[in-house]
Structure formats: C-alpha cells, structure tokens
Amino acid sequence: MNQINIEIAYAFPERYYLKSFQVDEGITVQTAITQSGILSQFPEIDLSTNKIGIFSRPIKLTDVLKEGDRIEIYRPLLADPKEIRRKRAAEQAAAKDKEKGA
C-alpha cells in the first residue's frame, strides 16, 4: 500500500507539539491520531471532546487523510468568549461612568 506524509499538531499557550510521519494511504484521522502516539504523550486529549481540524478547517474523525494534511487537535476553551466580551463591555462602561463622575 502507498504511504502519504502527514503532520499532527497540538498547541499549548507557550509551546506546541508537531510530528511528521508517514501513514498508509486511505487512513482515517482517528487511526492516524492513534498511530501517532500523541494520546499516550498527552493523556488530557479526549477525542470525544477535543475538536479536530485540518489546516483550521473542522473535520470528522472518520475523514480520510490526503498527502500533506496537518491534523490539528484543539484544546478546549478556558472561558466562554461571549462571557469574556460581556465582562469587558461592563468594565468599560463602569470606567466611563467613573470618568464622568470624577
């Protein structure tokens, strides 16, 4: 069977993990992730909850890989972006009110 070259990436705030390797043509994303050994290196990765993509495009674990694909395993968000925006807007409004009152 023919081999294809792929990469797998997992990023942290201060560093990232990137591994290049060859897999059999026709392999699924999930099989490649398992074969890469990344799940034993980073036990916090849970394929049922972590989102997965190829070059920032969301994909399914059952998708078949192509030559040159880079599988990206995304960490869960630490905070809800909508909640952060709401909090920031409230803080800015409070600061403006304080300036007006001063």
Swiss-Prot record:
Highest taxon, organism lineage: Bacteria
User: What's the protein here called?
Assistant: Protein RnfH
Q: Which PANTHER family match?
A: UPF0125 PROTEIN RATB (PTHR37483:SF1)
Q: What is the lineage of its organism?
A: Bacteria, Pseudomonadati, Pseudomonadota, Gammaproteobacteria, Pasteurellales
Query: Which InterPro entries does the record match to this protein?
Result: Mopterin_synth/thiamin_S_b, RnfH, RnfH_sf
- Sorted alphabetically, which Pfam families does this protein's record hold? Ub-RnfH (PF03658)
Q: Which family does it belong to?
A: Belongs to the UPF0125 (RnfH) family.
